[in-house]
Amino acid sequence: MSIEALRARLPDYAHDLGTNLALLVDDPALDPEARWGCFVASACAVGEPQTLRAIDAAATAAGLTAEANRAARKAAAMMAMTNVYFRAVHLMEGAAYQALPCRLRLNRLAHAGARGVTYDLSCVAVSAINGCGACLDSHEADLRGRGVEPTQIQAALRIAAVVSAVARTLAAEAALHPQNLEI
Protein backbone atom coordinates (compact mmCIF):
# COMPACT_ATOMS: atom_id res chain seq x y z
CA MET A 1 0.00 0.00 0.00
CA SER A 2 1.31 3.46 -0.89
CA ILE A 3 1.04 6.68 1.07
CA GLU A 4 -1.69 7.78 -1.34
CA ALA A 5 -3.61 4.55 -0.72
CA LEU A 6 -3.18 5.07 3.02
CA ARG A 7 -4.54 8.59 2.69
CA ALA A 8 -7.50 7.27 0.70
CA ARG A 9 -8.40 4.92 3.58
CA LEU A 10 -8.79 7.84 5.97
CA PRO A 11 -12.38 8.92 6.64
CA ASP A 12 -13.58 12.36 5.56
CA TYR A 13 -13.35 13.75 9.07
CA ALA A 14 -9.59 13.06 9.03
CA HIS A 15 -8.87 14.96 5.80
CA ASP A 16 -6.30 17.19 7.50
CA LEU A 17 -4.35 14.12 8.59
CA GLY A 18 -4.05 12.97 4.99
CA THR A 19 -2.99 16.43 3.87
CA ASN A 20 -0.35 16.62 6.59
CA LEU A 21 0.89 13.15 5.72
CA ALA A 22 1.37 14.15 2.08
CA LEU A 23 3.15 17.36 3.05
CA LEU A 24 5.53 15.62 5.45
CA VAL A 25 6.58 13.02 2.88
CA ASP A 26 8.25 15.83 0.94
CA ASP A 27 9.23 18.09 3.86
CA PRO A 28 12.71 19.47 3.10
CA ALA A 29 13.58 20.03 6.78
CA LEU A 30 15.05 16.52 6.94
CA ASP A 31 17.13 14.62 4.43
CA PRO A 32 15.38 11.56 2.97
CA GLU A 33 17.09 9.04 5.26
CA ALA A 34 16.17 10.97 8.41
CA ARG A 35 12.65 11.71 7.17
CA TRP A 36 11.85 8.12 6.21
CA GLY A 37 13.60 6.82 9.32
CA CYS A 38 11.25 8.93 11.43
CA PHE A 39 8.27 7.67 9.44
CA VAL A 40 9.25 4.00 9.86
CA ALA A 41 10.13 4.36 13.55
CA SER A 42 6.85 6.19 14.23
CA ALA A 43 4.80 3.58 12.38
CA CYS A 44 6.53 0.81 14.33
CA ALA A 45 5.90 2.65 17.60
CA VAL A 46 2.18 2.91 16.92
CA GLY A 47 1.99 -0.57 15.41
CA GLU A 48 -1.21 -0.26 13.38
CA PRO A 49 -0.77 -2.78 10.51
CA GLN A 50 -2.10 -0.75 7.55
CA THR A 51 -0.05 2.29 8.51
CA LEU A 52 3.09 0.27 9.16
CA ARG A 53 2.89 -1.65 5.87
CA ALA A 54 2.16 1.47 3.81
CA ILE A 55 4.95 3.50 5.37
CA ASP A 56 7.45 0.65 5.14
CA ALA A 57 6.64 0.18 1.44
CA ALA A 58 6.82 3.93 0.78
CA ALA A 59 10.15 4.20 2.59
CA THR A 60 11.60 1.36 0.52
CA ALA A 61 10.25 2.89 -2.69
CA ALA A 62 11.79 6.24 -1.70
CA GLY A 63 15.19 4.60 -1.36
CA LEU A 64 15.55 4.01 2.38
CA THR A 65 18.20 1.33 2.64
CA ALA A 66 17.55 -1.93 4.44
CA GLU A 67 20.18 -0.95 7.01
CA ALA A 68 18.53 2.43 7.70
CA ASN A 69 15.12 0.73 7.87
CA ARG A 70 16.46 -1.71 10.48
CA ALA A 71 17.94 1.21 12.40
CA ALA A 72 14.53 2.91 12.50
CA ARG A 73 12.95 -0.31 13.76
CA LYS A 74 15.73 -0.60 16.36
CA ALA A 75 14.97 2.93 17.50
CA ALA A 76 11.31 2.01 17.94
CA ALA A 77 12.17 -1.18 19.81
CA MET A 78 14.72 0.42 22.12
CA MET A 79 12.52 3.42 22.83
CA ALA A 80 9.59 1.11 23.63
CA MET A 81 11.70 -0.12 26.54
CA THR A 82 13.59 3.01 27.58
CA ASN A 83 10.59 5.33 27.27
CA VAL A 84 8.64 3.24 29.78
CA TYR A 85 11.54 3.04 32.22
CA PHE A 86 12.75 6.64 32.06
CA ARG A 87 9.25 8.07 31.93
CA ALA A 88 8.37 6.16 35.10
CA VAL A 89 11.55 7.27 36.88
CA HIS A 90 10.87 10.85 35.82
CA LEU A 91 7.22 10.75 36.93
CA MET A 92 8.07 9.22 40.31
CA GLU A 93 10.39 12.15 41.04
CA GLY A 94 12.21 10.04 43.60
CA ALA A 95 15.85 11.03 43.78
CA ALA A 96 16.74 7.50 44.86
CA TYR A 97 15.41 6.04 41.58
CA GLN A 98 17.06 8.69 39.45
CA ALA A 99 20.40 7.91 41.08
CA LEU A 100 20.18 4.17 40.37
CA PRO A 101 21.68 2.79 37.15
CA CYS A 102 18.89 1.60 34.87
CA ARG A 103 20.49 -1.85 34.46
CA LEU A 104 18.83 -2.36 31.10
CA ARG A 105 20.90 -3.55 28.18
CA LEU A 106 21.24 -0.63 25.76
CA ASN A 107 23.94 -1.81 23.35
CA ARG A 108 21.70 -1.29 20.31
CA LEU A 109 21.62 2.43 21.06
CA ALA A 110 25.32 2.56 20.21
CA HIS A 111 25.18 0.28 17.15
CA ALA A 112 22.22 1.63 15.27
CA GLY A 113 23.13 1.06 11.62
CA ALA A 114 22.27 4.60 10.55
CA ARG A 115 23.91 7.98 10.89
CA GLY A 116 23.73 9.08 14.53
CA VAL A 117 21.60 12.12 13.76
CA THR A 118 19.11 10.00 11.82
CA TYR A 119 18.87 7.48 14.63
CA ASP A 120 18.41 10.15 17.31
CA LEU A 121 15.72 11.90 15.26
CA SER A 122 13.89 8.57 15.07
CA CYS A 123 14.28 8.25 18.85
CA VAL A 124 12.78 11.73 19.28
CA ALA A 125 9.80 10.76 17.12
CA VAL A 126 9.15 7.55 19.06
CA SER A 127 9.69 9.24 22.43
CA ALA A 128 7.09 11.84 21.47
CA ILE A 129 4.58 9.11 20.64
CA ASN A 130 5.34 7.32 23.89
CA GLY A 131 5.26 10.52 25.93
CA CYS A 132 8.69 10.26 27.56
CA GLY A 133 9.86 13.76 28.44
CA ALA A 134 13.15 12.52 29.86
CA CYS A 135 14.07 10.77 26.60
CA LEU A 136 12.89 13.72 24.53
CA ASP A 137 15.09 16.07 26.55
CA SER A 138 18.09 13.74 26.33
CA HIS A 139 17.90 13.15 22.57
CA GLU A 140 17.05 16.78 21.84
CA ALA A 141 20.09 17.97 23.81
CA ASP A 142 22.31 15.48 22.00
CA LEU A 143 20.98 16.55 18.61
CA ARG A 144 21.34 20.26 19.39
CA GLY A 145 24.89 19.60 20.57
CA ARG A 146 25.65 18.15 17.14
CA GLY A 147 24.28 21.20 15.35
CA VAL A 148 20.81 19.93 14.46
CA GLU A 149 18.39 22.83 14.05
CA PRO A 150 15.12 23.13 15.99
CA THR A 151 13.19 22.98 12.69
CA GLN A 152 14.70 19.56 12.00
CA ILE A 153 13.73 18.26 15.44
CA GLN A 154 10.29 19.78 14.97
CA ALA A 155 9.95 17.88 11.67
CA ALA A 156 10.55 14.60 13.53
CA LEU A 157 7.87 15.62 16.05
CA ARG A 158 5.43 16.51 13.28
CA ILE A 159 6.00 13.16 11.57
CA ALA A 160 5.39 11.37 14.87
CA ALA A 161 2.20 13.33 15.49
CA VAL A 162 0.73 12.70 12.05
CA VAL A 163 1.71 9.03 11.82
CA SER A 164 0.27 8.44 15.29
CA ALA A 165 -2.97 10.21 14.40
CA VAL A 166 -3.32 8.37 11.07
CA ALA A 167 -2.70 5.00 12.72
CA ARG A 168 -5.09 5.64 15.58
CA THR A 169 -7.79 6.86 13.22
CA LEU A 170 -7.46 3.77 11.04
CA ALA A 171 -7.49 1.52 14.12
CA ALA A 172 -10.66 3.23 15.38
CA GLU A 173 -12.34 2.90 11.99
CA ALA A 174 -11.37 -0.79 11.81
CA ALA A 175 -12.91 -1.37 15.24
CA LEU A 176 -16.09 0.47 14.30
CA HIS A 177 -16.38 -0.99 10.80
CA PRO A 178 -14.62 -4.39 10.69
CA GLN A 179 -16.42 -5.27 7.45
CA ASN A 180 -14.28 -2.64 5.69
CA LEU A 181 -10.97 -4.23 6.66
CA GLU A 182 -8.56 -4.95 3.87
CA ILE A 183 -7.81 -8.65 3.54
From Swiss-Prot:
GO terms for biological process: response to oxidative stress. It comes from the Bacteria. InterPro entries: AhpD, AhpD-like, AhpD_core, CMD-like. It holds the Pfam family CMD. Disulfide bonds join 132-135. It catalyses: N(6)-[(R)-dihydrolipoyl]-L-lysyl-[lipoyl-carrier protein] + a hydroperoxide = N(6)-[(R)-lipoyl]-L-lysyl-[lipoyl-carrier protein] + an alcohol + H2O. Its EC number is 1.11.1.28. Signal peptide: none annotated. One of its GO terms (molecular function) is hydroperoxide reductase activity. Coiled coil: none annotated. It is an enzyme of class 1 (oxidoreductase). Gene3D superfamilies: AhpD-like. The keyword Oxidoreductase applies. Transmembrane segments: none annotated. The active site is at 132 (proton donor), 135 (cysteine sulfenic acid (-soh) intermediate). Keywords: Antioxidant, Disulfide bond, Oxidoreductase, Peroxidase, Redox-active center. Antioxidant protein with alkyl hydroperoxidase activity. Required for the reduction of the AhpC active site cysteine residues and for the regeneration of the AhpC enzyme activity. Belongs to the AhpD family. This is Alkyl hydroperoxide reductase AhpD. The lineage of its organism: Bacteria, Pseudomonadati, Pseudomonadota, Alphaproteobacteria, Caulobacterales.
